Amino acid sequence: MRKILYYALACCVALFASSVNIYADDDDSDSFGARLSGEVDYKIMKGMHVYASEELRFFGGSDFIDRSYSELGFSYKINDHLKAAVSYTAIAVNKKEVIMPDNEEITLQWTEWRHRVSADLTASVKVGQWRFSLRERIQGTYKMRELNNYQQPQMGWVLRSRLKVAYKFRSVPFEPYAYFEPRLLLNGAKWSEESLGKNYENASFLGHKDVYFNRYRCAAGLEWKLNKRNSLDFYMLYDHLYDKEIDARKEGSIKGVVLKAPIHGISSDRLSLGVAYKYSF
């Protein structure tokens, strides 16, 4: 079994490296990415677990880690159908910019930190070999860098609702699954109706109370239970992101904050290949 585990891990590393290289060679590499993560899960007592995980995300080239997620969490299985969890995540977002002072190319790199807290409740039901689940997660993310609060809040709150279906084979240690998850922004920057038309300069800021769906995520994957303690998860993840582009600036002490352009929506799509390893004890 140990040889199988080593072989599986080697295949994962090779698959991950090849996928990142493919993305790096693509002209639109920001639309593709790869994720590599590891998790340690400790069973305190029946139904009660504490876990720690680290995830690396790659976009725009194999030589650059776009961001990393360091998470510590606690989960409790209330009964056969309900599970609750809370977690804290430190997020490091790596940035780089190329400047040309005196016709000399210089690459600047820096890290922006974010702090995230979340609480979720998962309801699940088994029908034969099928398992259906719905997870509701409330999540808050605090950005450390200075922000224009008339464009976005310092602490963003979202509600993530994940609907998942999985099938567990009787004779083989594989579990294919798929899920769909919309994300509802709860406190976006809200402006008056004039912000959408020709009279945008007369729009007024109404506070952080704009509510709209700003992300849709779906994935398909295969979980491989290597043995009692070790498991691997291979998945393909599609992300559709939507946001409102707000250009608000303060002009003088009398006029206050004004919009420099009408508010409009922007969207982007990303496709990621992921490999996750989990050790339970």
Task: Explain the meaning of each model-derived region.
Residues 121, 267-281:
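Outer-membrane beta-barrel "beta-signal"
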Residues 47-52, 81-86, 128-132, 171-175, ...:
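Repeated loop/turn-to-beta-strand initiation elements of outer-membrane beta-barrel proteins
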Residues 137-255, 279-281:
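Outer-membrane beta-barrel transmembrane domain signature
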Residues 44-46, 73, 78-80, 122-129, ...:
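Outer-membrane beta-barrel proteins
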Residues 37, 71, 118-120, 160-164, ...:
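Membrane-embedded beta-strand positions in outer-membrane beta-barrel channels/transporters
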Residues 22-26, 48-62, 67, 84-92, ...:
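Transmembrane beta-strand segments that form the barrel wall of outer-membrane beta-barrel proteins
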Residues 60, 85-144, 148, 240, ...:
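Outer-membrane beta-barrel translocator/channel fold
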